């Protein structure tokens, strides 16, 4: 049963890339074994432990002796995880470093498509950005944050690859806001290349501007991505809000200097 479960998780696409092993994340010791077999290995151990406990329950009418072996096997997996984690878990260094304070900006502006139809694309972008500018100013000047995070797709057009002169001006405006704030910004936007558009997150610093873009690699089915066999004019007419983004390759990497600059 455990092998079948793991095989199905590996071969069948799921809406979300979750697995039972993720449930061990809150335990600093039990999650360490992921360096040996990944999250799938943790899932396998959890399933084996549950199979052993189920076998013990099935044998309980036969008395205590019949329970001992499956119970021992069921408890062995979590004990092994704890023991291994105790040996390899990193010791938290004693440091006086200040924790990173991040300002999460949530404007509660929703349904961009409806707003675009009612106000026009440029007016909507203007409203979204002005709202985030004001909230970011409060976060930087009054809350003294070290970085600012604009949640969701705050900038609903391509950043760094403007499609128009107005888009290029908005890009420069955002860069100017980041320079004035003197802290890094991360925000949702779109990216563009010859293959199409990507749902992305932009990393912008005061010193260097656009540091890089993360292209989302796991798109949400029927919202951000439609399988080719299902896509078509009829589908788009019935669900016009469905996205057409491409799947990205994951997180970018940047070299940093000794003072933290990329």
What are these regions (language model features)?
Residues 1-262:
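Enzyme catalytic cores with a strong preference for nitrogen-chemistry domains
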């Amino acid at each position: 049963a455990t092998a079948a479960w793991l095989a199905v998780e590996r071969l069948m696409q799921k809406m979300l890339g979750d697995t039972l092993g993720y449930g061990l994340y809150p335990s600093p010791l039990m999650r360490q074994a992921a360096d040996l077999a990944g999250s799938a290995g943790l899932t396998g151990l959890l399933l084996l432990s549950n199979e052993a406990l189920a076998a013990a329950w099935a044998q309980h009418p036969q008395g205590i002796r019949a329970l001992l072996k499956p119970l021992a096997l069921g408890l062995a997996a979590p004990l092994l995880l704890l023991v291994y984690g105790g040996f390899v878990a990193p010791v938290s260094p004693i440091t006086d470093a200040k924790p990173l304070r991040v300002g999460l900006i949530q404007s509660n502006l929703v349904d961009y498509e409806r707003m675009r139809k009612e106000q026009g694309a440029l007016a909507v972008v203007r409203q979204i950005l002005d709202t985030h500018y004001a909230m970011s100013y409060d976060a930087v000047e009054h809350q003294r944050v070290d970085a600012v995070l604009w949640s969701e797709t705050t900038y609903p057009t391509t950043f760094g690859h403007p499609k128009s002169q107005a888009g290029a001006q908005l890009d420069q405006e955002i860069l100017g806001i980041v320079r004035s704030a003197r802290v890094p910004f991360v925000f949702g936007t779109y990216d563009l290349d010859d293959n199409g558009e990507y749902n992305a997150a932009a990393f912008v610093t005061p010193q260097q501007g656009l540091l890089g873009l993360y292209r989302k690699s796991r798109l949400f089915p029927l919202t951000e991505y439609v399988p080719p066999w299902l896509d078509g004019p009829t589908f788009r007419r019935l669900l016009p809000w469905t996205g057409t983004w491409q799947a990205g390759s994951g997180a970018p990497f940047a070299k940093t200097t000794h003072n933290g600059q990329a």
